Amino acid sequence: MAVDMRILESLDQNAKLTVKELAIMLGESEESVAASIREMEEDHIICGYPTLINWDKTDRQLVTAMIEVKVTPQRGQGFDKIAERIYQFDEVDAVFLMSGGFDLCVMVHGKTLQSVAEFVSSKLSPMDSVLSTSTHFVLKKYKEHGLPLVQKIEDERMLITP
């Protein structure tokens, strides 16, 4: 399992690593690394290999929102059933069970503010068990998935001294 953890930690830092590169880094055979990865994929320990894209640097317009959702848990299923219904919408990027003032945090994306508002009003709010929602639009992303998205701008002004 120690090798599996080292594979996971390496892939978490750089999902582009090849089996060959991982094998060299870990001092293992390519076959054993490939088998470990395959097994972890089958067990849903490795669930995918997403790429982090800074959409603000492209021509594509994308609006991101965090929606606080208060729900009534269902008998015998708690929050799981409603969370499953919510995460199946294409607009939904992530759903988290939260502690505190609301139950679920739903991260969504859309082409416009209006498309996100339409999602909330026509799909999310009318669902059985949903008591209320509060939508917060992301204005700027500074860091995501542990990686900074903004570049430091060096101040090129000359210092003024008395």
Question: Language-model features: where?
Answer:
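A compositional/biophysical signature of low hydrophobicity enriched in polar/charged and small residues
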Residues: M1-P162
